[in-house]
């Protein structure tokens, strides 16, 4: 399993747009085989900081998601509106209350 955590902050005037862009790519992700991945986005309170946690069964599904046009568009627009650079962390999966993949 591949687990990646990405934390970043956007400019305050971009928070609403960022949420809209997230919902757009999540809509497309929901059309894919959800048994192969879990993609979760969190916002730190009412702040401008977002955390994306992605869990992929394998490299193939990760590559597929990273090529979804709406996700690429989200990344492009987000990068133009960053308040802080994204921090990317590769995590080790220990366990969950729900069976994954």
Give the location of each predicted region.
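Short coil/turn motifs at secondary-structure junctions
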Residues: 11-13, 43-45, 57-59
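Short, surface-exposed ligand-recognition loops at beta-strand->loop->(often short) alpha-helix junctions
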Residues: 9-20
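Glycine-rich beta-strand-turn "strand-cap" elements at beta-sheet edges
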Residues: 2, 8, 36-48, 76-101
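Short hydrophobic/aromatic beta-strand micro-patches
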Residues: 7-9, 53-55
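Residue-level signal for secondary-structure boundary sites
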Residues: 14-16, 60-62, 96
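An amphipathic, aromatic/His-enriched active-site/gating alpha helix that lines ligand/cofactor pockets
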Residues: 24, 28-37, 55-89
């Amino acid at each position: 399993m591949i687990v990646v955590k990405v934390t970043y902050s956007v400019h305050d005037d971009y928070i609403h747009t960022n949420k809209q862009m997230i919902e757009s790519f999540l809509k497309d992700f929901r059309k894919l085989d959800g048994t192969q991945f879990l993609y979760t986005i969190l916002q730190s309170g009412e702040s401008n900081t977002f955390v994306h946690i992605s869990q992929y069964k394998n490299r193939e599904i990760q590559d597929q998601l990273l090529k979804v046009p709406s996700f690429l568009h989200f990344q492009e627009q987000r990068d133009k509106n960053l308040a802080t650079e994204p921090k990317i962390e590769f995590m080790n999966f220990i366990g969950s209350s729900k069976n994954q993949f």
